[in-house]
Curated annotation (Swiss-Prot):
TRNA binds at residues 86, 132. InterPro entries: Pept_tRNA_hydro, Pept_tRNA_hydro_CS, Pept_tRNA_hydro_sf. CDD domains: PTH (cd00462). The gene is Ptrh1. One of its GO terms (cellular component) is mitochondrion. Pfam families: Pept_tRNA_hydro. It comes from Mus musculus. One of its GO terms (biological process) is rescue of stalled ribosome. It catalyses: an N-acyl-L-alpha-aminoacyl-tRNA + H2O = an N-acyl-L-amino acid + a tRNA + H(+). PROSITE patterns: PEPT_TRNA_HYDROL_2 (PS01196). One of its GO terms (molecular function) is tRNA binding. This is Probable peptidyl-tRNA hydrolase. Its EC number is 3.1.1.29.
Length: 204
């Protein structure tokens, strides 16, 4: 991981002539491969798809890893917080401030207990539905307007098993579903951003 304060500072302060979007993969920093951090895994796949997998830069101002990626005439600010899930919103809100973005221009990618593994959904704002990372983002941005890509991880049968489930790693059987799921999630998100980049911001 490269760390470049000068690069990060220059990029964040430069105006971009086209549309710019922030895409945040929510998760627990230092816990890759867990179900709760699947949003960060999707961000990794997006970075690979757009050819910027080697461009992640640690930005101390927002306590996150950032990568800028072109998408047609638009630009994506990819963000993976270097914080625990329940304070991810601090990184997202700080990055939004640095890049001059509104809540409607921020996509959150996160795990979803109430969808089985392999299922995806695009949710256009709304409540956190019990997700601590989303709740943190809503609180720090003072808005619930952020579009969200929900990545199903399934809910365990017993309520007492939820914490161990989300903090646990995917089983070998689940791992087989992850590769195509990462591609599907990337397609869904990028297609939605492309469509919005061509029209008015309100066209969710």
């Amino acid at each position: 991981m490269r760390r470049s304060w000068a690069l990060s500072r220059q990029v964040s302060e430069a105006r971009f002539p086209g549309k710019r979007w922030l895409v945040a993969g929510l998760g627990n920093h230092g816990m890759p491969g867990t179900r709760h951090s699947v949003g960060m895994a999707v961000l990794g796949q997006i970075a690979r798809r757009l050819g910027v997998a080697e461009n992640w830069t640690r930005d101390s101002r927002c306590a996150a890893d950032l990568a800028l990626a072109p998408l047609g005439d638009a630009q994506l600010v990819l963000l993976r917080p270097r914080r625990l899930m329940n304070v991810n919103g601090r990184s997202v809100a700080r990055a939004a401030e640095l890049f001059g973005l509104t809540a409607e221009e921020i996509y959150l990618v996160h795990d979803e207990l109430d969808k089985p593994l392999g299922k995806l959904a695009l949710k256009l704002g709304g409540s956190a539905r019990g997700h601590n990372g989303v709740r943190s983002c809503i609180s720090c941005l003072n808005s619930n307007a952020m579009p969200r890509l929900l990545v199903g991880i399934g809910r365990p049968t017993h309520p007492n098993m939820v914490e161990n489930h989300v903090l646990g790693c995917f089983s070998p059987e689940e791992q087989e579903l992850l590769s195509p799921l990462m591609d599907q999630a990337t397609d869904l998100l990028l297609d939605h951003i492309r469509a919005r980049s061509q029209g008015p911001l309100s066209g969710l």
